[in-house]
Amino acid sequence: MKFIILGFFLLSSMYAQEIKDHSFENGKIIYQQTCVSCHGKSGSTNPYMQLVVKPRKLSKTILTQEQSFQITKEGAHFWGAHSDLMPTFKYVFTDSELEDVSYYIAKAFNPDREKKIQKLLDESDSISKEDQSKMLKTGEKIFNRNCSMCHGMSGNGQSEYVEQSKAQKNFIYPYDLRRTLLTEEQIFLYAKYGGKYWGTMKDDMPSWKNKYDDFILKSVAKYVNEKIKTVK
């Protein structure tokens, strides 16, 4: 009986691996036929592309595999981007095909993402129970004083500063945070380390770790996640 169970387990494992291998290869084919022209063979993007907003480096993305799938399916604009550079592909490929692409990107370009993010979270300051009760109020204060200059008071990515940047031909495209896919932890890490650390080609979203401590940045992330973000 033990041999039968062991044999079944081995066959199941082999079948599961075969499915993963097929998903990887199919995702690779689609990526090379469709995505490579913007994101490059290694997912690091061609920095010489003549675009106002250049594609992100997939090798540094903060996104999970599921989040990458959602971005690819619906397009970046659906999830808060004010640039339509990353279009929707749901009318071109099936969900299964887009899941294969996301799987390929995760395994080929960013296999250590989870370890990297967990390490950064483990190294961040923990928040005491006493301070946790102050987070939303603190986050709102800092957001209104600092983040709203680009993202707007409501977090919609529209502000006077953004309009001035257009007039000066120095375009910036703050996200509509009401629709962001990022979790509270991801928002914290994105604010702490800045956009370039996570693969953007411009530094419109700077690192705030030298100005604010982890308590303040985690408070802002909590405020955005609970009070601004409308897509859960």
Regions found by a protein language model. Give the residues of each.
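Sec-dependent N-terminal signal peptides
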Residues: 3-12
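Electrostatic cytochrome c docking/interface patches
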Residues: 15-30, 46, 112-142
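Extracytoplasmic electron-transfer domains, predominantly the class I c-type cytochrome c fold
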Residues: 52-108, 164-227
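The C-terminal output helix
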Residues: 108-114, 228-232
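Conserved catalytic-core motifs of eukaryotic protein kinase domains, centered on the activation segment
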Residues: 48-50, 160-162
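Short, non-ligating residues that shape and space the ligands of small metal-coordination modules
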Residues: 44-45, 156-157
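The canonical Cys-X-X-Cys-His
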Residues: 27-41, 101, 139, 143-154, ...
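Extended amphipathic alpha-helical interaction segments
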Residues: 126-138, 149-152, 159, 170
